[in-house]
């Protein structure tokens, strides 16, 4: 019994320590992403506005979600609806990420399908509407349990409880997590995005193979689009790789019962680690990001003067 207690304590301490480290990396990395887009005029395009939206969601994970996840892991005694609201916040920014990724995929699709009309279709007003819709959907999906789909209104045991030890499973219904949050608002968008990127790659490949024009500009355009699409598909792949294990754990919990705490912790940490991955991907895969990262490092970290950025489009 004492050995189990010691192992659980060690697991809790390790989990909290890793959460803090991931949170700090996520905040610093994604603040850099926003800084890069602000500094580099060539990155101030529709796609990168959605990337900024994704970065804001990842910053929120570092600032809000991880501290709240730590509080929930400690099982602090608080009011039921306070605990429920904290768990809902954990979900809002997950869905903000998936909605931002969906917006990015749709934008790249329009870019290659409507080459000539793209700028007329993606007006500033429509971009802001799309961003607002992404966040509105995220808040509505994440806050749904506050309107009744929770353990208090559906469980006899919790109905008369005012204060409780705040645990995710104490307030959040697993049928909501599995059928609504995962199947409807994570899995279906992921499948749609994979289909979009497959079509993007198919269109670009056809355009490059057709060689219908002798213009080097056309070939260069689709070459850049192919590289950008590959980079953004990698971001999508990492999101799926990071979040699907935790969603599968939730499915196992709902259909077959509890999983070991250490497995749950690993799933949570992997999902949260996704928030610090994207800045690394951008640095390695998108040339303009790498150049601006280096500019920031030279100018602000080692106080070395650097040439200003050009405004050419990547």
UniProtKB/Swiss-Prot annotation:
Glycans are attached at residues 4, 12, 160. GO terms for cellular component: dendrite; plasma membrane; synapse. The keyword Membrane applies. It is a multi-pass membrane protein. Residues 1-14, 73-84, 149-177, 256-261 are extracellular. It is found in: Cell membrane. Disulfide bonds join 83-166. Receptor for adenosine. The activity of this receptor is mediated by G proteins which inhibits adenylyl cyclase. Pfam families: 7tm_1. One of its GO terms (biological process) is negative regulation of cell population proliferation. This is Adenosine receptor A3. Its main location: membrane. The lineage of its organism: Eukaryota, Metazoa, Chordata, Craniata, Vertebrata. GO terms for molecular function: G protein-coupled adenosine receptor activity.
